[in-house]
Curated annotation (Swiss-Prot):
Alphabetized GO MF terms: thymidylate synthase activity
Residues the entry annotates as binding dUMP: 22, 180-183, 191, 221-223
Catalytic activity field: dUMP + (6R)-5,10-methylene-5,6,7,8-tetrahydrofolate = 7,8-dihydrofolate + dTMP
EC numbers on record: 2.1.1.45
HAMAP family reported for this sequence: Thymidy_synth_bact
Organism of derivation: Aliivibrio fischeri (strain ATCC 700601 / ES114) (Vibrio fischeri)
Function description: Catalyzes the reductive methylation of 2'-deoxyuridine-5'-monophosphate (dUMP) to 2'-deoxythymidine-5'-monophosphate (dTMP) while utilizing 5,10-methylenetetrahydrofolate (mTHF) as the methyl donor and reductant in the reaction, yielding dihydrofolate (DHF) as a by-product. This enzymatic reaction provides an intracellular de novo source of dTMP, an essential precursor for DNA biosynthesis.
UniProt name for this protein: Thymidylate synthase
Gene name for this UniProt entry: thyA
Keywords in alphabetical order: Cytoplasm, Methyltransferase, Nucleotide biosynthesis, Transferase
C-alpha cells in the first residue's frame, strides 16, 4: 500500500503535464515506476484508501486467460470493464474490423491464446508457458505477450499491461509484468491485484511456490480531472491493514480455469477500506 501512495505522491510532486491526444485531456505524468508484490507471504496489494473492487480485476484476468474477445463474456464472469471500450469508442465503432455490439477485436487474451502466424496458424502462448512450467522447464522465454503492432487496427484498444514474464528458480515461480501506460487513480489498484493474482494462480496450477511479482509501469499518470480528488481526498487518508486473498485449492490446471472456475472460487478476507472515490474515466 505504501508503494502505491508513494507513486501517487510522486506524480503530484514531480509530474509533467502532457496533452493526451486520444482523450483530449492533460495528464500529470512521470516515467518509470517499479512496484513489488510479496505473493509468497500473502501480502495482497488491495488499495484501502478507497474502496476497491477486486472481483472485477480477477474476473478480467480470467477473461484474458480464456482468450475472450467480447465484453458480454467479461460481463458474464463478473466485470463490466470492457463495455465502454467495446461500445463507446468512436474510432472502434467506425472500424471495419468490428463485428458488432460488445466486440473487442484482437486484444489482450486473444493475442495470448491465438497469436496469428503468417501461414494462417496460431500460437497459444499461455498453454506453452503452462506446459513448460508444469514440467519444471524455464527456457528464459516464458513470456505472455499481448502487444502485437501488426493487429492494433483489429482491436478496440492497445494493451496497457502487455507483457508477463515468468521465471522459475528451483521450485519458486516469479513474475515480471510490464505496463506501457497506467491511469493511476483508476487503473493501478486494478492492475496490482491482477499481477498478484496471475503469479498466484499460475504457481498453483503448475505446482510451484509463488515468489515475488515485479510490476514495471513506464508512463504513470493522473488525468487533470482526477487530480483534485487524489490530492484532497485519497492522499489525505491513512492506509488500513492489508487483507488476505484465498484461491480454491481444487483449481489445478489451465483447463479448470478455462471451464468451471467462477468468482466463487476466490475470496478476500479481512478487507476494510475508506469510502469509494468516483474518479472520472477517460475512454
Amino acid at each position: 500500500m505504501k508503494q502505491y501512495l508513494d507513486l501517487c505522491q510522486r506524480i503530484v510532486d514531480e509530474g509533467t503535464w502532457i496533452e493526451n491526444e486520444r482523450t483530449g485531456k492533460r495528464c500529470l505524468t512521470v516515467i518509470n515506476a517499479d512496484l513489488t508484490y510479496d505473493v509468497e507471504n500473502g501480502v495482497f496489494p488491495l488499495v484501502t484508501t478507497r474502496k476497491s473492487f477486486w472481483k472485477a480485476a480477477v474476473a478480467e484476468m480470467i477473461g484474458y486467460i480464456r482468450g475472450y474477445d467480447s465484453a458480454e463474456d467479461f460481463r458474464k464472469i463478473g466485470t463490466k470493464t470492457w463495455d465502454a471500450n467495446a461500445n463507446l469508442n468512436d474510432a472502434w465503432l467506425n472500424n471495419p474490423h468490428r463485428k458488432g455490439d460488445d466486440d473487442m477485436g484482437r486484444v489482450y487474451g486473444v493475442q495470448g491464446r491465438s497469436w496469428a502466424k503468417p501461414n494462417g496458424e496460431f500460437v497459444d502462448q499461455l498453454k506453452k508457458i503452462i506446459d513448460d512450467l508444469s514440467q519444471g522447464i524455464d527456457d528464459r522465454g516464458e513470456i505472455l505477450n499481448f502487444y502485437n503492432p501488426g493487429e492494433f487496427d483489429m482491436g478496440c484498444l492497445r494493451p496497457c499491461m502487455y507483457s508477463h514474464h515468468f521465471s522459475l528458480l528451483g521450485d519458486t515461480l516469479y513474475l515480471n509484468s510490464t505496463q506501457r501506460s497506467c491511469d493511476v487513480p483508476l487503473g493501478l489498484n486494478f492492475n496490482m491485484v491482477q499481477v498478484y493474482f496471475l503469479l498466484a494462480i499460475v504457481a498453483q496450477i503448475t505446482g510451484h511456490k509463488a515468489g515475488k511479482a515485479y510490476h514495471k509501469i513506464v508512463n504513470a499518470h493522473i488525468y487533470e480531472d482526477q487530480l483534485e480528488l487524489m490530492q484532497s481526498v485519497q492522499l489525505k487518508r491513512e492506509p488500513l491493514q492489508a487483507p488476505i486473498f484465498k484461491i480454491n485449492p481444487e483449481i489445478k490446471s489451465l483447463e479448470d480455469l478455462e471451464t468451471w472456475v467462477t468468482m466463487d472460487d476466490f475470496e478476500v478476507i479481512g478487507y476494510e477500506s475508506h469510502e469509494a472515490i468516483k474518479y472520472p474515466f477517460s475512454v
